[in-house]
Amino acid sequence: MHLNKKAEVNMPNTYSQLYIQIVFAVKGRACFIKESFREELQKYISGIIAEKKQKLYAIYCMPDHTHIFVSLKPNIAISDLTRDIKANSSTFIKDKKWVNESFSWQEGFGAFSYSHSSLES
């Protein structure tokens, strides 16, 4: 198929079913995420995901890492969403002064796909 530069591909019936668990760690696996602010951090990250128009199913911040379970629309790459979550939440943590030391997330992340049937379990 040949498209000229002015041609636009319109896919009004695009359908996707992408369920992804994203996991990323605090740099050095330091236990910086405290119970005292865990829920507020989770709400903040939830807001980032909602702003990106993705659906959050579950989130849990452990002391040294975070799990996020989302369904992704095809308009965003996993790496872009994760980059935005990590960058914005890192700034949020620093602004709140929740951590006395320099806070940052470890480079990289894990992403694991799930079938629709696994949502119930």
Which functions belong to the PLM regions below?
Residues M1-S121:
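Basic nucleic-acid-binding interfaces
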